[in-house]
Amino acid sequence: LIPVNNKTVFQKKTPATSTTTIDEYPALADNISRLFYVQRNPNSNTIIYELNVGKDGQLDKDEPVHVYWIRYAEKGQKEELNYIQRKFAYGVTAKASGRDKYDIRFVSYKKFPLTLMKGEDGKYHIFATVNQKEMALSRIFIKIEGGTFWLPNVKYVEMKGTDPSTGKEISERFKP
């Protein structure tokens, strides 16, 4: 177990290999403002997507999602995305689509819509539809084999979350 800010953050598992799956990467402890996180091989550095709230506790309506790194492969420190990562790789765009509802898109994969809205529990969640199944998204794993920084060879994307109607954990994998 790895402590960060006096909290256990994740349980370390086996290192990434060519047969890596989402379950071989560390699962993060719950965090009240985190919407979901992304992990990808070849290392355990994790991209965090969390609610962007002001000191008054209100959601920033212009930029409702804050994205940053937890650099586990280094010292486990929090680090902001750099300009290239934010604008071309891991950043998101947000557009209001209703009261307390936002269309969220990855800058690197705009054709996959995500929705930020309040769930039945009254809290904000990111919802995604994969293979005709809606889920409240909790984590994404991206399997990369070769390619370049600008054009990685993505073998698959695996998403985990919960079914909003049953509360059961679901997992879906697709090839982008």
Residue ranges and their predicted role:
Residues 1-81:
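N-terminal export/targeting and maturation segments
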Residues 24-28, 40, 94-97, 149-151:
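Structural signature of eukaryotic scaffold interfaces centered on beta-propeller domains
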Residues 33, 156-158:
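Short, hydrophobic/aromatic-rich segments at coil-to-beta transitions
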Residues 39-40, 160-162:
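A generic structural motif
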Residues 49-51, 112, 172-176:
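Generic detection of short hydrophobic beta-strand segments and adjacent strand-loop junctions
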Residues 70-122:
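Predominantly extracellular/secreted and cell-surface proteins with exposed
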Residues 112-155, 163-166:
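Acidic, glycine-rich flexible loop segments
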Residues 161-176:
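Short, low-complexity, Pro/Ser/Thr/Gly-rich segments in the mature regions of secreted, periplasmic
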